[in-house]
Amino acid sequence: MLNICHINLAKGFRGGERQTELLIKALGQQDNVSQKVIVRKDSPLVDRLSGVDAQLSLHPVSKPYLFHARHVKDCSLLHVHEAKAGQFAYLATRIYKRPYLITRRVPNPIKNNALTRRVYSGAERIVALSDAIREVLTSYDANLDPLVIPSMVSSLPVNPQASEEIRHQYRNKFLVGHAGALVNHHKGQQYIVEAAAALQQDYPQIHFLLLGRGRDEEWLKRMAAGLNNLEFLDFRENLGDFLAAFDLFVFPSLHEGLGSVLLDAMQFRLPIVASRVGGIPEIIEHGKNGLLISSGDSRALAESILYLYRNAAIRRDLAENAYQVSLNYHPHSSARRYLLLYREILSGPARMGTAAKG
C-alpha cells in the first residue's frame, strides 16, 4: 500500500487548492493508495475532502505547524502543494527521514534564501505545471530538472435550471465572464474594467460579470463606479452554472503559471481571450482555440471582445477547438502520472537525509 501525505497550508481556496483537491480525489480511485492530507484548520479543503474516501485521512493543523510533524511518520512519501508546505516537509523530513516532492504552481521568482534553497534541493523531484514554470525553476537551480505535469480540468457540476435562470436574468445580453481572485497585480482585472468602460456607450448589450473576491475588490469597484455594464458577483461555489451561461471568457492576467480556470472554461466550450503570459500559450493557440493579447492592454482586450461578439462562427470554432484541447487534461491522467512518479521516487536511491521506502 502506497501511503501519500499531501501538504497544503494555504489560507484560502484558489486554483492551487482546487488542483490539490482534484488530484487527491483522482488518486483515491486508484488501487493500493492511501492518503493523508495536512491542511490548516480553517482551510476550505477540510470540508471539501471530508468523507471523500475511506483511504483518506484529514489532519487539520494550526501554528506552529512543525508541532504536527508526527503525522508524516507512517507515510511513504510527502507531496508538497505550496510554499509553506515545502518548509514544513523539509523540516519534518529532518526528523522522520521521509522523501518529498514539490509541485510548483506559480511562475513567481523563488526566494533566494538559505532555507528555500534547502527546501528545493532536498526534494526528490520537482513538478512544474507548465514549461514557463519549469524555466523559472531551472533558472533558480540548474540541478532541479523539473518534470512538467499540467493542471487538470475540474469537470464542474452544472444545474441546468440555475444556468438558465442566469441567462434569463441577463436576457438579450452578451455575457463576458471572468473568474479569479481579485488581485490585480496577478489577474489584471483593471483591464476588464477599462475594456468595459470603452465598450459601454456603443455596445451596452455586452455585459461583464466578474466572479471572485480578493484584496483589490474595493479598489476595483471604485474604478468601475458608474459602469452599468459590469458587475462583481463575489466568489461562487456554482461556478459551473455561470460558465454554462457565459458567451465569452476573459483572462487578462499579468503573470500566470497555467491558469487552471481556463481549462474549465474550455471544457464548457467557451471562446476565450487571455493574456500571452506564463503557461497560458501552452494551452491556448492564438486563432485556433482562443485569442491571445499582450498583458496590460485593455484596448486589445476590448477589440478582441468586440471581434468575437461580431463573429459568431469564429466563436463557435474557437470554443469547439478549446473543448477538444480540454480532453487532454483529465484528472485521471494526472493521477496516473503522479503515481508513476511516486513509485519512481520510492524505488530509486534517496537523497542524503531521507531513507523511507514506505
Q: Which role does the model predict for each range below?
A:
Residues 38-39, 271-274, 284:
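Short hydrophobic beta-strand element within catalytic cores of glycosyltransferases
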Residues 235, 254:
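Aromatic "clamp/platform" in nucleotide-sugar-dependent glycosyltransferases that forms part
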Residues 72, 100-128, 140:
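A conserved, positively charged/aromatic
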Residues 3-7, 169-187, 193-196:
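Conserved donor-binding/catalytic core segment of Leloir-type glycosyltransferases
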Residues 123-146, 153:
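A short, active-site helix/loop in glycosyltransferases that binds the activated sugar's phosphate group
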Residues 14-25, 183-198, 215-218, 291, ...:
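A conserved mid-protein helix/loop that constitutes part of the nucleotide-sugar donor-binding site
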Residues 80-86:
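Short His-centered aromatic/hydrophobic patch
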Residues 286-287, 291-298, 307-312, 327:
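Conserved acidic donor-binding segment of nucleotide-sugar-dependent glycosyltransferases
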